[in-house]
Amino acid sequence: MAPETPNDLGAPSPSLRAGSVRGAGAAYLMGVAVRPTVLFVTAFALNATPHEAVHAVTAYMLGFSSTLYQMWVNPDSAAATPRQLIAIAVAGPIFSLIVGLISFALYRWRYSRRPSGLLFLMFAIVAFYIPLGGSIAGDIHLALGFGGASKLQMDLISVVAVLMLSTMMFFMGKELCSWAPPWFSRSQAVLCTTAGPWLIGTILMTLVYLPIPRFLIAPNLVSSVFWAFAVIGACFSKRTMPALRPIRSLTPPDLFVTAAALLMVRLLVHGVRLAH
């Protein structure tokens, strides 16, 4: 079996790039362009739904039944103590943070020059995004409330989370842009690697997760604005690394993982009860 590592020790010449464009079919080019968006939706599903499952399992371990859905969990925690509520609330963000660190480490140390690297990068972005967003108006915010934090403390943590999330997305945008084909123009590279996942991917993700309560739709759409910093980062990317990235259309492993992720989401649409 041929190794995944690309055989490109140097940047392709302009004539080779032009030949690549002429030789590539329309379907291939479309697959290259939409791959980041598809993998963003896949990474979101593989992060968000297990994240909610961790909340449900934590509640169950603490003695509370719950119903797990594709994007939220409904624990029977009316009798829970503040400490138990905090444990349930922070379990998901801790899980996502660990997944993000592992994914980014694997990306940097092993997969950054393999086709599967783009999925690991998207996986890390989404996994970091979830706990930071939760510090603004999500799980961490709820945990602080259960712990009796003052409004000033919660506001300060939200400000820090906004700064961290904006900075993270800026640099991730620069990294994502390196996955654009070298024959793409700057605008095409930005569109396929950051603007596409943000604008098209968010809509697709919402459609995949339907039906969901209305109170979840607006926050997901609003929180996606931090992708604007990824777009800005991509715009400022020097694009000195594209020759080191294996440019691919959608691969069979991509499609398999995407199908598995979507199946997992749809299986939870009607809820799974974890009862004592």
PLM segments and residue spans:
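Hydrophobic transmembrane alpha-helices and their immediate loop junctions
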Residues: 2-276
